């Protein structure tokens, strides 16, 4: 390690990685929230923890706002939940190998939270930044931010800028200014059961009907337009000697803009049964609207690139990515938004997830300059 500061950053991040906080483990998320809250409070930030219900971890809010300061400020967004189940640390322990710090949730996105919060801790006193800074850490981003979305949008309504701690894109630590919108279709087919040997002709196979629907859905994929439709799970039938009466599938779709979103939603809602005497139950929604690179976001990027240069690295803009994040919500509200400002590394959602130790000081310096001077 190059310096004592890097050693301190590594030690802090390692301690956070020891707390497993998968999305479906509210107790673990609550423990992680308490760790983050204690760190923020010790720095002098105002901290609030809010319950989002028994099946979801708490929402964490930290700020350097002075009492009564209602000016639009900087909103930092992060999430404390991970995709890794409890017990992952046993097979993928926190460790350093060369320049890589491995551990579940390291890259996505506990190191990013640690860097941004450490920078904010240095300007915790009200008035130490040009704009007030609000830091919101949600417990359910990996599962769609269903419980926290309303709170994200509430804070974003009073934000001049939104900065998101999702990990930097691999191979250069690029930031993100455009993300596809994400949606989900739950399709249920109801047929008619019958004995598969004695009364086969009286049955109406839900699986047969679903096969037609799967082909129609997958055909909605249009790579030239940036649209993908993927039937992710499918289940149907009960026993082999009964014509299946029920079949269901769950479909993921990604769209680059609202025009494409409206087109896909319309086509899915207009799905019709191919066979006789079967029914379709269609439940489809756009979970995250597309994050489109606006002129305002481009201007913010140009400004922020100057802070990165002063911190010692080149901050490039990544192409539109197919994965969604909470940046989709703020961008859709018209808030200039930059994403992918977290730690540099690779391997999100895998057991090979890591961050690059040699980049930590530069990324921290970047956040320090950004929070102090952005106006």
Placement of each model-derived feature along the sequence:
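Acidic/histidine-rich catalytic neighborhood of metal-dependent amide-processing enzymes
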Residues: 109-178, 375
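Acidic/His- and Gly-rich active-site-bordering loop/insert found
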Residues: 1-104, 125, 306, 327
């Amino acid at each position: 390690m190059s310096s004592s500061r890097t050693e301190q950053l590594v030690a802090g991040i390692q301690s956070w990685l020891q707390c497993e906080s998968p999305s479906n483990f509210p107790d673990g998320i609550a423990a992680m929230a308490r760790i983050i809250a204690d760190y923020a409070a010790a720095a002098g930030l105002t901290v609030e923890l809010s319950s989002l219900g028994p099946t979801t971890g708490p929402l964490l809010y930290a700020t350097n706002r002075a009492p009564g300061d209602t000016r639009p400020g900087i909103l930092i967004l992060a999430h404390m939940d991970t995709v890794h189940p409890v017990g992952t640390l046993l097979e993928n322990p926190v460790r350093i190998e060369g320049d890589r710090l491995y551990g579940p949730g390291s890259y996505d996105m506990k190191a990013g939270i640690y860097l941004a919060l450490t920078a904010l801790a240095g300007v915790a006193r009200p008035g130490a930044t040009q704009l007030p800074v609000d830091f919101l850490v949600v417990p359910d981003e990996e599962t769609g931010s269903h419980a926290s979305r309303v709170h994200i949008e509430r804070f974003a309504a009073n934000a001049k800028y939104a900065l998101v701690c999702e990990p930097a894109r691999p191979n250069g630590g690029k930031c993100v200014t455009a993300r596809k919108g994400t949606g989900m279709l739950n399709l249920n087919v109801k047929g008619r059961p019958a004995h598969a040997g004695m009364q086969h002709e009286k049955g109406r196979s839900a699986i047969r009907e679903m096969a037609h629907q799967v082909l129609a859905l997958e055909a909605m994929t249009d790579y030239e337009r940036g649209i993908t439709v993927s039937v992710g799970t499918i289940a149907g039938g009960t026993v082999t000697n009964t014509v299946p009466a029920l079949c269901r599938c769950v479909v993921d779709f990604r769209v680059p803009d609202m025009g494409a979103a409206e087109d896909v939603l319309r086509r899915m809602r207009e799905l019709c049964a191919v066979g006789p005497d079967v029914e379709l139950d269609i439940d489809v929604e756009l979970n995250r609207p597309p994050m489109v690179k606006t002129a305002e976001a481009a201007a913010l990027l140009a400004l922020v690139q100057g802070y990165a240069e002063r911190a010692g690295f080149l901050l490039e803009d990544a192409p539109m990515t197919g994965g969604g994040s909470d940046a989709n919500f703020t961008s859709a509200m018209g808030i200039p938004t930059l994403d992918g400002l977290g730690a540099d590394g690779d391997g999100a959602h895998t057991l090979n997830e890591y961050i690059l130790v040699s980049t930590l000081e530069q990324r921290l310096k970047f956040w320090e300059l950004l929070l102090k001077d952005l106006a």
